[in-house]
Amino acid sequence: MFTSWGVETPRQFTEGTPIGIRMGFGAPFNKFTLCMPTWGDKTVSLTLSLYKWDNDFDTTRENAPVATKKIEKHPDNGHALLSFDEQPAGEYLICIDEFSGGRLGAWQMSAAVSNAYTYESGVEKPASWEISVSFTKTPVEPFFQ
């Protein structure tokens, strides 16, 4: 697992706005987790998906996801886990979508530690998130741009 550093702040997402995190993974991997606050709301549901990156946010989302999971009643600061068959090193999009039932967010890092790009409604924004990744082989560099 890769552990990030920096000051973390919970950031609330806007309901109905898909959130994307594009990252270059430096080794094969088979799961990731996001620690996601709900500010005490107990009925939050969301869909967590992984896509192989394809040119831009919209084109990527038109393709079938590598893996997807509907999460019901996500606990406050619970770890949203997505497991899948081993994927090769490369560029991917993590998508948080279809969330409802209360507030939902993620822990934003004070410094860019993963060379990630964040998308809100398809628009690229600067942000870095607390993400744990399970690599199946030891990476020389966990993440690349």
Question: Predicted segments — roles?
Answer:
Residues 1-62, 73-145:
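Beta-sheet-rich sandwich/jelly-roll-like modules and their strand-loop junctions
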